């Protein structure tokens, strides 16, 4: 496994720290022109930018003006508002023939300080003040990113980044990575508000999570749960949105489960039963209440002489007839499969691992079904 043929130089380099331009064919499959288009970690991307500034400063073949222009190209490509605010310091240093500073980025740390302060207030029985402080902190950071020239996004994995690139990114979009803790802060606020003030108060933060991470099933599922608490059965589309980007069996099963209940409440017995059956097929026994709910649904359907599917095959047929997703036969399955193959062929093993795990798990069987051959292959990508 340590042979250079199977672990080429640079194959374990993270996309955030690499400098690779992709061929047109690779760019099409990954939805990115270069390795930065696969980045998911803001901190690493910013550090790579700082390192590039130092490299530019040391380049004796460039004049000072050209150095400043190169640095601005880096800043514009990353498009982070905190880095953009430091542009004048970078260009001034390069024009003066000096090295660029080693910047410290503080937006994320400042947010963590406010989150910690809010938690202290919450545990001191100052719930309203805690919520107010936390909401002010996230609102400020939301505004900072909204005022920039890029599209602020959060990604939980490299596989999700590829899915986003292919399904959601617009032509020539400048995707900007937000601090991870901004996304988590919205999630925390949604959880706290849903418990203290009810589902309606949590909805704005859940909508913000969906906006930041449209390729992350958890965002859609949390929104669906709170909509259902409000007996808003239009929560079904949120479940379907989660299902269409689900790369994990548990996510897909839970999305089907939530969708089934929403459909039941809308008296759509056939699709509700189909979704319950698919949920249990994908992750058997994972949801304790599923079996009893399905039995009650079938009983009510029988009492009204409404036919419902009783097998996995029949359930899949019902879903397909209604133009509903039949997991894992969804668009993202082909996207991650092609992307995994390309990343391996292009010696980009870090994103290839995440993509390959997703491919292995997106199968028609029960359980993760990562067999010994797939496990050995995944090990080889870590060598």
Segments (PLM) and residue ranges:
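Flexible helix-coil transition and linker loops at the boundaries of alpha-helical arrays
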Residues: 99-106, 138-182, 207-212, 244-252, ...
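Alpha-helical linker/edge segments of TPR/alpha-solenoid repeat scaffolds
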Residues: 78-97, 158-176, 231-238, 261-274, ...
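Boundary/linker segments of alpha-helical solenoid repeat arrays
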Residues: 82-85, 141-149, 216-220, 247-255, ...
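TPR/TPR-like (Sel1-like) alpha-helical repeat modules
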Residues: 135-139, 241-246, 264-288, 292-316, ...
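"A position-specific structural signal for the A-helix of alpha-solenoid helical repeats
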Residues: 73, 97, 109-112, 116, ...
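Residue at a conserved register position within TPR or TPR-like alpha-solenoid repeats
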Residues: 121, 193, 227, 263, ...
């Amino acid at each position: 496994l340590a042979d250079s043929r199977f672990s080429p130089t640079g194959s374990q380099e993270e996309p955030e720290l690499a400098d690779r331009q992709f061929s047109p064919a690779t760019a099409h499959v990954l939805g990115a022109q270069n390795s930065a288009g696969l980045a998911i970690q803001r901190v690493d991307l910013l550090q790579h930018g700082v390192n590039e500034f130092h490299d530019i400063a040391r380049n004796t073949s460039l004049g000072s003006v050209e150095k400043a222009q190169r640095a601005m190209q880096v800043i514009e490509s990353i498009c982070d508002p905190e880095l953009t605010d430091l542009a004048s310091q970078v260009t001034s240093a390069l024009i003066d023939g000096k090295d660029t500073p080693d910047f410290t980025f503080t937006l994320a740390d400042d947010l963590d300080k406010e989150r910690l302060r809010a938690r202290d207030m919450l545990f001191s029985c100052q719930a309203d003040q805690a919520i107010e402080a936390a909401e002010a902190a996230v609102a400020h950071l939301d505004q900072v990113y909204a005022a920039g020239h890029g599209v602020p996004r959060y990604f939980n994995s490299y596989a999700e980044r590829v899915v986003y690139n292919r399904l959601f990114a617009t032509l020539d979009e400048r995707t900007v990575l937000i601090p991870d803790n901004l996304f988590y802060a919205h999630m925390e606020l949604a959880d706290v508000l849903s418990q203290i003030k009810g589902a309606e108060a949590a909805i704005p933060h859940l909508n913000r999570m969906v906006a930041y991470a449209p390729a992350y099933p958890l965002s859609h599922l949390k929104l669906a749960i709170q909509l259902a608490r409000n007996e808003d059965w239009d929560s079904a589309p949120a479940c379907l949105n989660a299902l269409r980007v689900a790369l994990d069996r548990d996510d897909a099963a839970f999305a089907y489960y939530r969708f089934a209940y929403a459909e039941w409440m809308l008296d759509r017995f056939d699709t509700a039963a189909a979704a319950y059956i698919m949920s249990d097929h994908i992750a058997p026994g994972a949801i304790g209440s599923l079996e009893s709910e399905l039995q009650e649904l079938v009983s009510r359907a029988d009492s009204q002489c409404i036919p419902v599917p009783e097998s996995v095959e029949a359930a899949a047929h019902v879903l397909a007839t209604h133009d509903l997703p039949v997991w894992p036969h969804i668009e993202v399955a082909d996207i991650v499969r092609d992307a995994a193959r390309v990343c391996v062929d292009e010696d980009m093993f870090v994103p290839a691992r995440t993509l390959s795990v997703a491919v292995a798990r997106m199968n028609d069987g029960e359980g993760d079904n990562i067999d010994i051959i797939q496990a050995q292959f995944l090990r080889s990508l870590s060598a």
